Amino acid sequence: VRYSPLLHLNEGLVYDEIVGAVQEGLDLARRQYGIVCGQIICGIRHISAASSLELAELAVRWKGRGVVGFDLAGAEKDYPAKDHIEACLYVLNNNINITIHAGEAFGAPSIHQALHYCRAHRIGHGTHLIEDLDLMAWVNDRRIPVELCLASNVQTKAIPDLQSHPIRRFMEEGLRVTLNTDNRLVSGTTVTNEYRLAVENYDLSEDEVLGLVMNGFKSAFLSLKDKTQMVDQVLTEFASQGAAFSGEISRRRRSQI
């Protein structure tokens, strides 16, 4: 669950109460339905670096109690990621993973900043990575996950239409591509719908669909043990769907997380 507590300070609520309330819901989901979910706390680029640092400190306080990562979201243009470097370094120094929205509403230099200044472990959107092939190769070589959001990118005009999205090129180059919703409420989408859009618009094979699913689990901000268990569960589920996936499943069982 990725959100900014800064946007929920209503009726006297304070940061720790907000995170605690969210965690109660996630704990209940895990007990009742077996859903495993962590919290990613977001700083907001266009609000202030000071508030991002407060949220970074909040993330560190809740490390080991549900918070698994820190994000930097909000307007890219005129609000560079490097302005929030203090917040990013604070969470890094406390061994918390970082993902940063970059390359959605601004070009490849925004992605470069997120990676080389703020040292992000994942890139949110990354649509404009296609504009810098050298940086794209660097991202690929380091298996940095790229969190693509198809419906959202069309709605925000990051791309003119789905046919213009670089997902197919990214996949052909071997990038660790994942499919995401961005904002379910604003975009009116689901993870299932994002996969439907991908299959219908980019002629994905069954093996490619499995690859995208696996990339998502491999890129999760979870422990190696938890990710390994989830990957095994997913492969077992796909195996139950028939022989179509058998060759790819055998290969992926041998691959590294």
Regions found by a protein language model. Give the residues of each.
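Divalent metal-dependent hydrolysis catalytic cores, especially in the metallo-beta-lactamase
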Residues: V1-E11, V36-C42
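Glycine-rich tight-turn/loop motif centered on a GG-T
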Residues: L7-E17, K77-A81, Y117-G124, S152, ...
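Short, small-residue-enriched loops and turns at beta-alpha junctions
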Residues: L9, I44-A50, G74-P80, I100-G107, ...
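Histidine/acidic residue-rich metal-binding segments in metalloenzymes
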Residues: V19-R31, I35-G38, S51-G69, D78-I100, ...
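Conserved, mostly hydrophobic/aromatic
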Residues: F70, H101, I123, V146, ...
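Active-site neighborhoods of metal-dependent hydrolases
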Residues: G124-T127, D132-T181, V234-I257
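Flexible, acidic glycine-rich loops studded with aromatic residues
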Residues: D161-G216
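Mid-to-C-terminal alpha-helical segments outside catalytic/metal-binding sites
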Residues: D203-I257
